[in-house]
């Protein structure tokens, strides 16, 4: 029987805690956060839950909460990542992170290399497994990209495309952490081009797609994300030698943030306004609503009215098969807001990221990780990929694959 510590009881952490509460192999789900009220509210809904207040800025606080656990699930903001990593090593337990902290080094790329190298060695030395990038993107989308490789002899280019078209009458530009969203959108993006990791301008290099299930052609642009880094670093071993890997993002959040960026309002450099020094980024962030996470909050937004409830997650892998150039299109279908709320009382963002994140946790619970050390979500074995996608289907998340001649997109 497993004991799991879930650090951070926001959208992702709370969803994972609820999923693990239903797993027969789980004896206890320890829910930890600095916000005691949020912890108490979550624990009230669980059969196996226990709450604890943790100050994640202090490693010893995490270590104390992790005593005797089999796994730490890190659903905290990125700056806490180094403390949680070190606490997992000190507690000699397995580790799962929805993201990949950018706080280990000044350069995020070097930080990920450090995790693949030094941290992987340290987890392997204690016989434990750590996995990063375990939400929907990164996470599910990485698993889908790996599955696409089965249909290619060699891969040239991978597009990881995400379009989020959800719009409500209530002002809600982001359905996840506004801080994370704006931080991503205020930075240069990453791409893997001609076999090298490069920085690209945010909102640049647009692509346009018309998918059958969307009512219009959509635009997706460069966006700072993990996938080109993981897949680029692992291209030779896991992605059939792909030389070009992109993450493209579009939808309501991009439409909201791009004009702000052009106006300089996502800058973190102080400017003088009427004799006062202000940071534009902080001013914008201060005026954004938090993502809804409680059932009554979500219900109120739905009752006020939903203008659009659509989206797309598509991996396009271009390469060679039997001497012919082909494209493998993998379309992910998942519940939108209304269906997610009907199924689980949560938002579509919570459903896709939290539920799909919990499937990486389930691989731990089922003792399916054979790897020791630190891996990312694109490095699963074929057996792990099969189990993950089968469980995803049980949650209403499916993948439709089309292999067709490549004529350019």
Task: List where the protein language model places each region.
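Conserved N-terminal Rossmann-fold NAD(P)-binding element of oxidoreductases
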Residues: 4-8
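Hydrophobic/small residue at the entry helix of a nucleotide-binding pocket
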Residues: 12
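Helix N-cap at the beta1-alpha1 junction of Rossmann-like dinucleotide-binding domains, i.e.
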Residues: 34-38
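Rossmann-fold cofactor-recognition segment
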Residues: 46-58
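Conserved Rossmann-fold cofactor-binding substructure of NAD(P)-dependent oxidoreductases
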Residues: 56-68
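N-terminal Rossmann-like NAD(P) cofactor-binding module of classical short-chain dehydrogenase/reductase
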Residues: 70-75, 95-96
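Rossmann-fold NAD(P)-binding glycine/threonine-rich loop
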Residues: 99-128
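C-terminal catalytic/substrate-binding lobe primarily of soluble NAD(P)-dependent oxidoreductases
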Residues: 150-409
């Amino acid at each position: 029987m497993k004991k799991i510590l879930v650090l951070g009881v926001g959208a992702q952490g709370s969803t994972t805690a609820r999923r693990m509460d239903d797993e027969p192999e789980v004896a206890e789900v320890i829910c930890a956060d600095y916000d005691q009220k949020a912890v108490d509210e979550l624990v009230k809904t669980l059969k196996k839950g226990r709450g604890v207040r943790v100050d994640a800025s202090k490693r010893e606080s995490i270590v104390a909460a992790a005593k005797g656990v089999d796994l730490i699930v890190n659903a905290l903001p990125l700056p806490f990542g180094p403390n949680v990593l070190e606490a997992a090593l000190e507690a000699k337990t397995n580790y799962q992170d929805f993201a990949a902290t950018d706080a280990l080094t000044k350069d995020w790329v070097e930080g990920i290399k450090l995790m693949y190298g030094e941290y992987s060695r340290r987890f392997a030395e204690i016989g434990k497994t750590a996995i990063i990038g375990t939400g929907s993107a990164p996470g599910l989308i990485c698993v889908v990209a790996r599955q696409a490789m089965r249909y290619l002899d060699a891969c040239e280019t991978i597009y990881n495309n995400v379009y989020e078209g959800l719009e409500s009458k209530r002002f809600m530009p982001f359905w996840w952490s506004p801080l994370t969203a704006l931080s991503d959108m205020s930075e240069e993006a990453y791409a893997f081009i001609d076999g090298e990791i490069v920085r690209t301008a945010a909102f640049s290099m647009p692509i346009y797609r018309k998918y059958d299930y969307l009512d219009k052609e959509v635009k997706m642009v460069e966006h700072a994300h993990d996938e080109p880094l993981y897949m680029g670093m692992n291209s030779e071993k896991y992605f059939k030698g792909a030389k070009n890997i992109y993450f493209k993002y579009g939808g309501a959040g991009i439409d909201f943030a791009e004009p702000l960026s052009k106006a300089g309002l996502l800058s973190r450099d102080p400017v003088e306004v009427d004799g006062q020094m202000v940071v534009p980024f902080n001013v914008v962030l201060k005026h954004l609503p938090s993502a809804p996470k409680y059932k009554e909050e979500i219900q109120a937004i739905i009752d006020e009215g939903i203008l659009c409830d659509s989206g797309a997650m598509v991996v396009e892998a271009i390469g060679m098969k039997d001497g012919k150039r082909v494209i493998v299109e993998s379309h992910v279908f998942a519940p939108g807001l209304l269906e997610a709320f009907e199924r689980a009382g949560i938002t579509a963002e919570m459903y896709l990221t939290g539920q799909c994140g919990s499937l990486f946790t389930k691989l731990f619970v089922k003792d399916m990780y054979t790897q020791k050390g630190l891996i990312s979500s694109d490095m699963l074995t074929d057996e792990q990929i099969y189990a993950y996608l089968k469980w995803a289907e049980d949650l209403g998340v499916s993948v439709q694959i089309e292999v067709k001649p490549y004529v350019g997109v």
